[in-house]
């Protein structure tokens, strides 16, 4: 996942140039397994990265996909949560995270299609801005020190995300 910066040609109050940052994440699988937490951390990840770059996150967007939430429980695929539970709990999770920090979500779009019965779509995105003076752009030099902070990383380079590729059984879902 990448952050994209756009140089703002205008100035704020005639004093300082700002950079715009756009960040998005998908949490399809985590939201399907645990809808509240999956959707909440989808937005959380979008917020975390620009904040770590000394920017101000000020707007969010959520785009999701689900099968018909009115699908009878008897038609829920084996090993899957009911669509209604996923839709309602994911909305609560995303909203909870954003509301706790006062982030406005200006655009929400949920697509309903039978194709989402097998795999949910959960996309979060934010817009952030940083004064240009907060961004230091230099080329790395031989001998520069790199400090890595964080938890252990899996072989895929993504740590906790390794769970999103694991097969999940019906027994696993019932246990959680």
Predicted regions and their residues:
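Short glycine-rich loop/turn motifs
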Residues: 3, 16-19, 119-124
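Short helix/loop capping segments that flank catalytic or ligand/cofactor-binding pockets
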Residues: 12-17, 22, 30-33, 59-61, ...
């Amino acid at each position: 996942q990448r952050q994209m910066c756009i140089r703002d040609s205008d100035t704020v109050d005639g004093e300082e140039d700002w950079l715009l940052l756009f960040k998005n994440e998908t949490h399809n699988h985590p939201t399907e397994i645990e809808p509240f937490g999956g959707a909440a951390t989808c937005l959380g990840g979008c917020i975390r990265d620009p904040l770590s770059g000394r920017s101000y996150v000020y707007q969010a967007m959520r785009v999701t996909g689900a099968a018909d939430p009115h699908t009878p429980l008897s038609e829920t695929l084996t090993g899957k949560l009911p669509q209604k539970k996923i839709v309602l709990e994911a909305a609560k999770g995303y909203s909870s995270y954003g509301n706790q920090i006062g982030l406005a979500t200006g655009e929400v779009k949920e697509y309903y299609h039978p194709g989402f019965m097998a795999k949910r779509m959960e996309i979060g995105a934010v817009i952030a801005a940083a004064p240009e003076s907060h961004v230091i752009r230099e080329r790395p030099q031989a001998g520069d020190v790199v400090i890595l902070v964080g938890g252990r990383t899996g072989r895929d380079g993504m740590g906790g995300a390794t769970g999103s590729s694991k097969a999940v059984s019906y027994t696993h879902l019932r246990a959680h």
